[in-house]
Amino acid sequence: MRSPVGNTYETIAFIACMGVLCALVVELFSKKGIVLAAGLLLGAFSCQMGILYESSQAVDHMDPLVAILRSNFLLSTHVITIVLGYAAGLLAAVLSHIYLLASPLRLIGGKTEQSLDRMAYGILCFSLVFTLVGTVFGGIWGNESWGRFWGWDPKENGALMIVLWQLTVLHARKAGWLSSWPVSYTHLTLPTTPYV
């Protein structure tokens, strides 16, 4: 059995699918329509990024994975969990961008603004849980595969950076430093996630 996320191209496609799926689940509860727009933007942007990446780099293929990456339940769980967390984080970032663009133009207000705030906050909490659990699974897998839980390589550092940033945003919100802005500073997460 092979994990559906074995290379960069597959990761981008998986993020697009999971981001849209997260948007659909949130839309079932909110029924505001704005989350569908955010999911559409995330899906379209991710697909476009995948097309551009594949056409410019053309380095990813559906080649068989190296032995250490094959048939490892913990690795598959780690990768799927952390990429789901990244997709949810990107969805929260897109919602925050919508808020930051629409609020000053008075396109949204009142209950829609509060609803958008709650949705971005909830999605960011969901993202944090999956990103944190995925990072820990990655450490456990690394310890079993290479004998070290944490090696400070770029992917590990990137995952840690995303977890710490999400924790910072959520704690700042809880402390009242972000008060009426929805977790609007999650938009800074957007540039960091694709590079992990």
For the regions a language model picked out, list residue spans one by one:
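Single conserved hydrophobic/aromatic residue that forms the stacking wall/gate
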Residues: 187-196
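Membrane-interface interhelical connector segments
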Residues: 109-113
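Hydrophobic cores of alpha-helical transmembrane segments in multi-pass integral membrane proteins
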Residues: 1-61, 77-104, 116-145, 154-188
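Juxtamembrane membrane-water interface segments that cap and precede transmembrane helices
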Residues: 63-76
